């Protein structure tokens, strides 16, 4: 354990950094409850998106890193805020006008617009659990509705009434004058309508365990805060949950950062110890806007997994969690190829600290599979797909087998999967956007030079030699920036702005096939 500890800390990999923070907060001792509790949260107002997966994937990376550093048992819970009142109707669900009739109702009290589960909230929870299960996450699922109604939070809710003034003193300075007049940490569930009410509380009684408010007719209504008859506002709810469940580690998006101090103070007021926390940056869409469950303006988990292996998605989640990243379809090929590179480096590396620093160690929780692609990248397969437009992967294997006779679907099942993924990605995201550049007279001279070069080279010419020859043709053509030269070639030959190292691509595609491609543009 001491050797692992030393190398883990030396690696400076962020899951180990976080794990050490947790261990330090415990002074290396087992908590009274007997385990360290990791918590992730889910707001089921809309369909789970890739950010939801990301939070859970990162959390498990920290949990597994902690287990490497300590023998203290751990538990992960995924908490769904499914008792929240509906504030906004998502745009990416069926029958939104039906859902709009249930504004302010708890999500588990709204009919399922998909027609599959007992409520809208239950459907969203099922969607979350199904894809968490698919990735083998080991977790316990907690429903806010169930926790409130089963009395799990009753003791804390009574304490909220006992500490009511102290909580209000903390919360009120964070609001505008208008909101201060109506705010209460407690939101009664209306006995008549079932709605979550944001109303001023006229009276609270810690001994009786009740709050009193005025209804629309001016009548005083007294309700218990226990047994699911009241819910806390989301900020006090966050801190209360930490205290009630004795959470040791939580991560949340940057949109929570401004309120993190409030969560921690509420937790302390209620007698708890705030957990170690990590604030991660949010994902942005291609326009730089925050991705949203209700907008559905993001790549879905299904989109990614249709076109690439799950470990490429996990790699995207691992990298720089505290830095904002754009999440759009172009990131998929880049992360597949990054994963291949990291995987190969991991198995060549003998230094354990450097292995611990490699993302694939954390993606696979220490059990890193060995893959073989014979130097063929996902991007190269995409470009091959782009020029031959195959109906199935056997067409790609025809080129792969000529390039590397040792490569077969059996000797490289990973490469076989990538070939299938490449065809799907091409059909979904490249094919419709291809736009060819008509060659100018200058371009035709360049293409003829490339054709002459290809006619002169021997079959065994290495990719680097071909690449240099193409580079020299660009230099001779007088381009100030060779990036423009290669961009022109990609647009003329592939119908896209970016492309592969042409030397490697020609070796894979074949010299004779490349000559036909060039001739077709002359």
UniProtKB/Swiss-Prot annotation:
One term under GO cellular component: cytoplasm
Ligand binding (ATP): 293
Alphabetized UniProt keyword annotations: Aminoacyl-tRNA synthetase, ATP-binding, Cytoplasm, Ligase, Nucleotide-binding, Protein biosynthesis
UniProt record, GO biological process: lysyl-tRNA aminoacylation
Any one Gene Ontology molecular-function term assigned to this protein's record: tRNA binding
Subcellular localization(s) per the UniProt record: Cytoplasm
E.C. designation(s): 6.1.1.6
Motif ('HIGH' region): 44-52
Parts of the chain that traverse the membrane: none
Family to which this protein belongs: Belongs to the class-I aminoacyl-tRNA synthetase family.
Annotated protein name in UniProt: Lysine--tRNA ligase
Organism for this UniProt entry: Rickettsia massiliae (strain Mtu5)
Gene name as annotated: lysS
